[in-house]
């Protein structure tokens, strides 16, 4: 299987012939990027480090935990207005001009075949050549859902990415920026 979910650790693992891509839903519901590199069967959650970050913002749900900051954690799909001051993947604005989306894990689905992008150029695969992982992140206050789509063609060594943004409310939202991916990699100095 190219896509594996470990419900105990809440880790998604995507395997190709030579690479592994891993993400984890943390205890607060944020989707964190763990690993992308040479193929491994190990759980890479040990790469997450928590240190006192007294001057970094943290989500309200973190309470007084100064070791939890989105500015220091490798988010899979970071958005503006959550205390992460690095490059973002998403910036939306509601009709009142508020630019913020606090995206938390809502659901996921693993299915056979690769997702389709109607009217856009894309990699195509037969039903038995690929698997799709769809992860839904949502902000109930901003009334927006972000559907992260991962297409895994294991034998071809390909992982594709796409994003669908859904307005779940009645008000208008403006998409100021939307990227298919934001790969957060630690620098090695």
Please report, for each region that a protein language model flagged, where it lies by residue.
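N-terminal accessory beta-strand-rich subdomains and adjacent acidic, glycine-rich linkers
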Residues: 1-189
